[in-house]
């Protein structure tokens, strides 16, 4: 080890001596809260298939006429696109909750979402309703995941409002 390297280590050791127990507790609390938040967000991606499938199914049950008209979700192709997009949207919301990187909203998959539904003949009101149902299910999933955790849960209200905000941004792309 060189002299300069050992001096650097000694200097860092002296700096660490100035860290109080309160600072260490604050750091531990920050790490625990961040880990809990990541666990909650991870539950969204783990349940994305079920959330998307349930939302599409619920929308069809609410709109029986949507499966009987000319512009319907009656084909396998249209249904698979809705399910695929639902899962993609949930992953995008998860990414936004972690990174808050708004550039993902300008990506082609979201910019062309409205055009895709129009080309397939999927009524935009139905697509919007699916995303609203997904938002509600995601928030419910977040609440149940966080409530089963031990420790501080103060981050939940911020996480829920941020989730609602991100879904609203995506829903507004369809309007």
From Swiss-Prot:
Modification comment: Contains one covalently linked phycoerythrobilin chromophore.
SUPFAM superfamilies reported for this sequence: Globin-like
Domain of life, per lineage: Bacteria
An individual GO BP term: photosynthesis
Binding-site residues, (2R,3E)-phycoerythrobilin: 82
Keywords on record: Bile pigment, Chromophore
One Gene Ontology CC term in the entry: phycobilisome
Effect upon mutating residue 82 to S: Loss of chromophorylation
Induction field: Constitutively expressed at very low levels.
Similarity comment: family membership: Belongs to the phycobiliprotein family.
Known role: Green-light absorbing phycoerythrin of unknown function.
Subunit structure: Homodimer.
PANTHER family with a match to the protein in the record: C-PHYCOCYANIN BETA SUBUNIT, PHYCOBILISOME 32.1 KDA LINKER POLYPEPTIDE, PHYCOCYANIN-ASSOCIATED, ROD 2-RELATED
More details: Prochlorococcus does not possess phycobilisomes, instead it uses a divinyl-chlorophyll antenna complex for light harvesting.
Protein name as annotated: R-phycoerythrin subunit beta
Chain's gene name: cpeB
């Amino acid at each position: 080890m060189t002299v300069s390297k050992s001096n650097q280590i000694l200097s860092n050791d002296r700096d660490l001596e100035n860290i109080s127990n309160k600072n260490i507790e604050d750091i531990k609390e920050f790490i625990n809260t961040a880990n809990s938040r990541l666990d909650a967000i991870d539950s969204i991606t783990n349940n994305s298939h079920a959330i998307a499938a349930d939302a599409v199914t619920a929308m069809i049950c609410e709109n029986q006429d949507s499966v009987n008209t000319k512009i319907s979700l009656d084909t396998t192709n249209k249904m698979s696109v809705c399910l695929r997009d639902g899962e993609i949207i949930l992953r995008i919301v998860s990414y936004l909750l972690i990174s808050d990187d708004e550039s993902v909203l300008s990506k082609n998959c979201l910019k062309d979402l409205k055009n895709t539904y129009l080309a397939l003949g999927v009524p935009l009101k139905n697509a919007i309703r699916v995303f609203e149902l997904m938002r509600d299910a995601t928030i419910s999933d977040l609440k149940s995941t966080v409530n089963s955790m031990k420790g501080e849960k103060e981050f939940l209200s911020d996480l829920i409002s941020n989730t609602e905000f991100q879904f609203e941004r995506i829903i507004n792309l369809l309007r």
